[in-house]
Amino acid sequence: MPVIKVRENESFDVALRRFKRSCEKAGLLAEVRAREFYEKPTTIRKREKASLAKRHAKRNARENARNTRLY
């Protein structure tokens, strides 16, 4: 869990913003959302495989667009 020390003469808003930023960097919110409900290992693998396929398709589309002649 991210911990921050409130500096002298630091407003609450600034300290809260620093805490939120440190939580975001640590990936705390994403971890909580991922663990909110149980997800079967097969579902996890399926989701990761789908995201990998999407990433590859995106990369291939960019490569094809780059190699297409415009004239």
From Swiss-Prot:
GO biological process: translation
Positions with biased composition (Basic residues): 48-59
Entry keywords, A to Z: Ribonucleoprotein, Ribosomal protein
Keyword hit for Signal: no
GO terms for cellular component: ribonucleoprotein complex; ribosome
Biased composition (Basic and acidic residues): 60-71
Name of a matching Pfam family: Ribosomal_S21
Family label: Belongs to the bacterial ribosomal protein bS21 family.
Gene Ontology molecular function: any one: structural constituent of ribosome
PROSITE patterns the UniProt entry points to: RIBOSOMAL_S21 (PS01181)
Protein name per the record: Small ribosomal subunit protein bS21
InterPro entries registered for this protein in UniProt: Ribosomal_bS21 (IPR001911), Ribosomal_bS21_CS (IPR018278), Ribosomal_bS21_sf (IPR038380)
Region of interest (Disordered), residue spans: 48-71
